[in-house]
């Protein structure tokens, strides 16, 4: 706006922007900072002053962007294109808002977000920015498909082929080729050892992923099949394994969480095994018909699954797909129900969202910049 705003002491401030938490702003707003929800932000007017604050570490930052956008008309279109409206003189708008995101973890998986941290923060996503100045990020150790990350076949398979899935009489391992033999107790011991080592440098509230590789070659050995036959389905076997890891993690630090996938052959709820309280279920929509809303009859089976997971998941995360992975350039007819799908997730108790769009080299697709915005 061409106006330089001096930084002044709070006690002597008048006609000021109060940014961040303080005893004074807490009193003026009538809030207890400790009771604020994750990433909650407040944009409030007090006489001729503005209070821009919220939950640490990102609430105040979000409040500043909120006022710039909705009070002054600034638009952050992409990392390289910003629209700053001109005004003949500086003014205070009348805009106020208090808001806490329904999803505590928010990631739009596009290169525009992944490679440009400052823009990611302006879009209120919180899984990519790593510096304190940008509010940090929600850390998920390992990301996804971590069986082969924590026990890579390239390292362990030659000495311990029995740790890996048996398929048609042959042991197979690797991210694209196989899974783990989840009933193998020696494998479980080593896996837990590795997970605890990975958690070592991380503090309270850390999340670590323990999830199947990106294939459907689950183990067909006698022990694994007997467990499935006795308890219900492949999800039971996965959760029995994940629960044992989660129990070890809880002994290490009771504030930490273990995330796993409800994906492909584990998308359905288990028959008997229930997830521990420190287990996060990330339900994936991969089999859905994305040209139709998730609450349509075309996606009835997913509606059944998410309703069932809502009943038993201590924490429910979502991995959603919002592009055509076969042809990124082809128009994807999901514009009108993107918001409806997100609302469906909220209605079923989901508290984190990962929207996988077109990404990778070039990251060019169906109006990608607009989709990110």
Where in the sequence are the language-model features?
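Surface-exposed patches in mature extracellular/periplasmic domains of secreted proteins
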Residues: 3-11, 79-80
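Acidic/polar loop patches that form or flank catalytic/metal-binding clefts of enzymes
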Residues: 5-7, 257-260, 315-320, 349-357
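Short, well-ordered secondary-structure micro-motifs within conserved domains or adaptor modules
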Residues: 8-33
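Feature activates predominantly on carbohydrate-active enzymes
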Residues: 33-240, 247-252, 262, 280-283, ...
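Short acidic/His/Gly/Ser-rich catalytic and metal-binding motifs that mark active-site loops
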Residues: 217-222, 290-291, 365
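Substrate-binding cleft/loops of secretory-pathway carbohydrate-active enzymes
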Residues: 259-287, 329-337, 362-367
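Glycoside hydrolase catalytic-domain groove-lining segments
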Residues: 269-276, 283-324, 341
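Substrate-binding cleft of secreted/luminal carbohydrate-active enzymes
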Residues: 333-373
């Amino acid at each position: 706006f061409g106006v330089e705003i001096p930084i002044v002491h709070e006690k002597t401030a008048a006609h000021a922007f109060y940014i961040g938490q303080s005893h004074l702003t807490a009193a003026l707003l009538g809030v207890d900072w400790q009771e604020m929800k994750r990433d909650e932000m407040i944009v409030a007017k007090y006489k001729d002053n503005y209070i821009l604050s919220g939950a640490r570490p990102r609430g105040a930052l979000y409040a500043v962007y909120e006022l710039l956008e909705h009070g002054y008309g600034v638009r952050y279109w992409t990392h390289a294109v910003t629209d700053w409206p001109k005004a003949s003189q500086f003014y205070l708008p009348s805009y106020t808002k208090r808001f806490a995101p329904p999803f505590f973890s928010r990631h739009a998986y596009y290169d525009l977000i992944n490679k440009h941290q400052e823009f990611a923060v302006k879009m209120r996503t919180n899984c990519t920015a790593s510096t304190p100045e940008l509010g940090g990020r929600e850390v998920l150790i390992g990301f996804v498909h971590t069986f082969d990350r924590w026990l890579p076949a390239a390292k362990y398979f030659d000495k311990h082929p029995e740790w890996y899935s048996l398929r048609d009489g042959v042991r197979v391992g690797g991210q694209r080729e196989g899974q783990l033999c989840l009933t193998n107790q020696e494998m479980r011991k080593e896996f837990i050892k590795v997970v605890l080592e990975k958690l070592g440098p991380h503090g309270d509230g850390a999340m670590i992923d323990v999830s199947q590789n990106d294939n459907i070659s689950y183990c067909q050995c006698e022990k694994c099949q007997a467990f499935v036959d006795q308890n219900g389905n492949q999800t039971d076997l996965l959760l029995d394994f994940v629960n044992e890891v989660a129990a070890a993690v809880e002994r290490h630090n009771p504030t930490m969480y273990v995330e796993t996938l409800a994906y492909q052959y584990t998308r359905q709820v288990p028959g008997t095994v229930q997830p521990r309280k420190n287990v996060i279920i990330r339900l994936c929509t991969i089999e859905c018909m994305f040209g139709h809303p998730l609450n349509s009859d075309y996606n009835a089976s997913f509606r059944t699954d998410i309703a069932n997971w809502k009943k038993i998941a201590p924490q429910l995360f979502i991995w959603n797909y919002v592009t055509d992975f076969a042809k990124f350039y082809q128009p994807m007819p999901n514009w009108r129900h993107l918001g409806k799908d997100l609302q469906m997730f909220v209605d079923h108790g989901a508290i984190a969202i990962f929207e996988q769009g077109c990404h990778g080299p070039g990251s060019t697709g169906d109006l990608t910049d607009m989709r990110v915005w």
